[in-house]
Amino acid sequence: MTPENEIKVDPPAAERVGRELSRWFGNSDFATRPKPAELHRDSGRHVDWARVLPFLLMHVACLAVIWVGFSWVALAVTLVLYVVRMFAITGFYHRYFSHRTFKTSRAGQFIFGLMGASAVQRGPIWWAAHHRHHHVHSDKPDDVHSPVQHGFFWSHMGWFMSHKHFAADLSRVKDLLKYPELRFLDRFDIAIPTLLGAGVFLLGVLLKHVAPGLGTSGWQMLVWGFFISTVAVYHGTYTINSLSHVFGRQRYKTGDASRNNVWLAIITLGEGWHNNHHHYPASVRQGFYWWEFDITFYLLKLMSFCGLIWDLKPVPAAVREGAGKRL
């Protein structure tokens, strides 16, 4: 019997499910990614339900707030973790790993990656690869999260649920692949969020024991501090892909639909100045003018004063006021 005539037997269902679930834990190993032929056949709209189940359960877990109740300390932890992790995404995953708008030490780079991984948006290599792809194809057919091309839902969250886009074009991030510690974060991208969730739970247990008057518990802190905070960071981040290419003002002619939106800038610590960013992605600052609120830039500037980062790339005046600016 020739190879062409051989009968192909699918592996047992349990093995297939196990293989799919194992892909949730990795992205760096080539064997975990769809083969080129699979990517060619896949339209990109096939949702990989086995892999996205944890993402969906994260939302369902927020409903447990009905049972765990409310306390001011739980709300405070939720807000702190929202700001810290949103900054980790905007300042580190976006402005550092994706665009290299400043420099840091190798140890600092790893710490930035750890902080970004705590936001449960996968590893820095995967995140940066997709974002660099977006800038090359912004609002063109190959832009996987363009609302202009694919509509609101797909640009907001549907794209990363797909089998096809679980993979990333690693040719765009060769500068990051040379660091084994970053590949480790991508390979085990669920590890840091798991540790954070456990830590938040234990904090609640401790506070219930030493300060019962605060009215919190391990389960309450887990629901508020981890699940609700994480989901809020999710959708705050996703609005930049979906809403900031639809609503707002275009200061510059960038060849795409990117907009500046003050409300999105507030909830994302400065990322809402998206038209500015697409006009000049190399700048560490996205609020080009003093009145454009950019908390991420202010925090990065503070870090530079402390010597943690350096060589912050500014917006050249000629770029800010030059060609492409609308009157």
List the model feature ranges, each with a label.
Residues M1-Y238, S283-L327:
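Non-catalytic, topology-defining segments of multipass membrane proteins
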Residues G69, V246-Y252:
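A short, flexible low-complexity segment enriched in Lys/Arg and Gly/Pro that occurs
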Residues P147, W154, S244, I266-T268:
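Short glycine- and Lys/Arg-enriched binding-loop motifs that mark or flank ligand-binding interfaces
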Residues V173-E181, Q250-W273, H279-Y280:
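Active-site-proximal inter-transmembrane loops
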Residues Y234, Y238, S242, V262-E271, ...:
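Short amphipathic alpha-helical segments
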Residues L243-G248, Y280-R285:
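Interfacial helix-loop-helix junctions of multi-pass membrane proteins
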